[in-house]
């Protein structure tokens, strides 16, 4: 059985990156929440 986590920098960026977050209203809400909480890193 292969491992479930097969890292790919490109897929990671496309799904969880800053531009992906900014592309949707919900994604912008995620960023706003993380800014309000004072997260050091907003996205991956």
UniProtKB/Swiss-Prot annotation:
GO cellular component labels: ribonucleoprotein complex; ribosome
Sequence ranges of Basic residues compositional bias: 31-44
InterPro entries, alphabetized: Ribosomal_bL34 (IPR000271), Ribosomal_bL34_CS (IPR020939)
Keywords: Ribonucleoprotein, Ribosomal protein
GO molecular function: structural constituent of ribosome
Region (Disordered): 24-44
UniProt-listed GO biological process terms: translation
Pfam families (UniProt xref): Ribosomal_L34
Annotated PANTHER family: LARGE RIBOSOMAL SUBUNIT PROTEIN BL34M, MITOCHONDRIAL RIBOSOMAL PROTEIN 34 FAMILY MEMBER
NCBIfam families per UniProt: rpmH_bact
Family under the similarity heading: Belongs to the bacterial ribosomal protein bL34 family.
Protein name: Large ribosomal subunit protein bL34
Organism annotation: Acinetobacter baumannii (strain AB0057)
Gene name, Swiss-Prot/TrEMBL: rpmH
């Amino acid at each position: 059985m292969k491992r479930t986590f097969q890292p790919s920098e490109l897929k990671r960026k496309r799904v969880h990156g800053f531009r992906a977050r900014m592309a949707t209203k919900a994604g912008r809400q995620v960023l706003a929440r993380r800014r309000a909480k004072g997260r050091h890193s907003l996205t991956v």
